[in-house]
């Protein structure tokens, strides 16, 4: 297995340029069967050029699968039109179906594999068999065309119910409208963060500044020794964000239910949290040999 990792000395670290990804594909194309990449990178929040990367990898004879956990419900996707071979995702992030909810699968129609003898190279559970023959008990697998043919067993009714409830909300709008609102929300967040950075410092935005290269998320890399106190202070102010050790927090205003007022409240809380964390860090720095954080006042 070959991993595609950002170059640490690169001025764009930790981002991955499309050209760099393509160069790694070319370097290993002769002995690569499958390319698996995230649509949006979970750590940096970078949105990859799915269409371009897919086309290039396929031109080198590589089967392309996308992990869309952080992309589905976040950015518009046209998997069939982009000729993606297959994709998978969860539904508890931007789809809002809740933890443990059922995931999703896309399989391009050309990869349906509905005729023998290729069935042995695929998932072939009984729930993926055609409905007309599913209970015939012939010991013969006849898959349903498309992603449905890759199901193994009947899904949980409770999981489906929570997903359907969320999809009903999405159906009241469309991804183009949600994406437009998301760009404005995250753009507003970015603008306030840039102003705070100039005033307080102590963090950098590592997510691409180009809205077309990101979703709702902005990842903020904190200066050393601030993360734990910042997270504690945000929690005490009823602000929920995500942390990635050792020094990154992920902030994602969701266009379905967050508004510009929420973004403003976050910035005020984050500014206060940074100031408290910096004070604690400075106090600890004058205590030789201390390996414990002082309690915040």
Where are these regions (language model features)?
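Pyridoxal 5′-phosphate
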Residues: 1-297
